Amino acid sequence: MHHPFRTAAALAICAAGLFSMAVPALAAESFTPPDVSGKSVEELIDAFREEHNLDETNFELSYYNTVSGESYDYNETKLLYGASTYKLPLNLYYYDMQLAGEITGDTMITQGSSLDEAHYQSLVYSNNELSYSLWRRIGDWPEYKMAMRKYFTMTDDEIPQNYYYDHVFCTRMMMDTLKV
């Protein structure tokens, strides 16, 4: 059955959607990127911080160029609320166990979810339920946080006690994990 009103409404909605996507695309065409030639990462980040009024109270950064080896850190040991960042070292922990032959991708993490599926859901879709199942297999939160220490270069003296009990990490910890 043909419904001309529904067809027209659907076309209008599609046209509005396409138009709303075209406006930012057209604006992007007129954007002129800043000239960064001859500037170091530090100079670029310092200019960005100045432009956006960022300082050690509201900005933390760790940068590493995998091609050149260039790195830059700013306020990199300041602990901040971790959100889903805990999933990076958590998944690496299980990948290490797989490489050591201690566990396989077919190992069931929950009823119905293998380790391979848990990795995928945790890293691609940020699935909290499966990620929680992964860290609970290690132990409680302080035990999980202790197990993750093997990926970090920070010394015991550099890591405050609240690291073990709060959901906090710093950019240096995450960068260390990425470099493993």
Sequence positions of predicted segments:
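Bacterial N-terminal signal peptides that target proteins for export
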Residues: 1-10
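Beta-lactamase-like hydrolase cores
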Residues: 15, 21-79
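Surface-exposed patches in mature extracellular/periplasmic domains of secreted proteins
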Residues: 56-63, 103-110, 131-135, 156-162
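Mid-domain, small-residue-enriched loop/turn segments at the edges of structured enzyme/sensor domains
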Residues: 131-180
